[in-house]
């Protein structure tokens, strides 16, 4: 709690940004995780999945600490409700990453040439959507200093629009993946099919929550 008090003393957004870095540490493992799966290195998949779970637990603990600290009456120049919602959405991103990682340990899955390239494109766009909103949140303390006005605020609104566009691109890629999996020419076992569907849904959850987070940040800036 003393660490959080110090962070809040720097900026009301500093704890959110510290939490964001833990969330980012779960998202950033996804590419190495799926690369290990592609190579058939299931031992590394297990190690990386444990890493994601560890980082998610840390993020969850910090989220709870921030919530308690916000209830302590610390002065804030923005709505407590807004900050609580932002950190809750951020935490849901780490939850999605952990869910995906756990699914990869349920069964020794494999990539198929029919969807491998499309899948990594989908994953890349999804990570980009998160990185865009993360960039916005890292700017929030600077925006506070400038009363959310000027070029920085305009830049943030552009980034929010970028997240929305990336989420739409993710939706289109997800649709293309669905077409592959439901094609009459594509043969995959039932267990593998179910797991891949859940994995794709989990990845989609990251882009959806990134867009939701971007809009909430934008609303917070507009309310100021």
Curated annotation (Swiss-Prot):
InterPro entries: DUF47 (IPR002727), PhoU-like_sf (IPR038078), Put_Phosphate_transp_reg (IPR018445)
One matching Pfam family: PhoU_div
Gene3D superfamilies assigned to the protein according to its UniProt record, in alphabetical order: Phosphate transport system protein phou homolog 2, domain 2
Domain of life of the source: Bacteria
Protein family per UniProt: Belongs to the UPF0111 family.
The protein's name: UPF0111 protein CT_691
Organism: Chlamydia trachomatis serovar D (strain ATCC VR-885 / DSM 19411 / UW-3/Cx)
């Amino acid at each position: 709690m003393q660490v959080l008090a110090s962070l809040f003393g720097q900026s009301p957004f500093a704890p959110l940004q510290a939490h964001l870095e833990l969330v980012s540490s779960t998202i950033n493992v996804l590419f190495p995780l799926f690369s290990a799966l592609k190579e058939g290195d299931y031992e590394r998949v297990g190690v990386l999945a444990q890493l994601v779970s560890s980082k998610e637990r840390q993020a969850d603990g910090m989220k709870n600490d921030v919530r308690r600290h916000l209830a302590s009456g610390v002065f804030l120049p923005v709505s407590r409700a807004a900050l609580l919602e932002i950190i809750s959405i951020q935490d849901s991103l780490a939850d999605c990453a952990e869910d995906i990682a756990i699914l990869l340990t349920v069964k020794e899955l494999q990539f198929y040439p029919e969807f491998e390239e499309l899948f990594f494109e989908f994953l890349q766009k999804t990570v980009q959507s998160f990185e865009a909103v993360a960039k916005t949140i890292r700017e929030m303390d600077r925006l506070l200093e400038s009363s959310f006005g000027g070029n920085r605020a305009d830049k943030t609104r552009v980034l929010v629009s970028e997240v929305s566009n990336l989420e739409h691109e993710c939706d289109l890629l997800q649709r293309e993946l669905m077409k592959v999996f439901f094609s009459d020419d594509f043969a995959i076992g039932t267990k593998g099919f179910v797991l891949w569907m859940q994995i794709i849904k989990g990845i989609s959850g990251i882009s959806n929550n990134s867009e939701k987070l971007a809009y909430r940040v934008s609303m917070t800036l507009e309310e100021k």
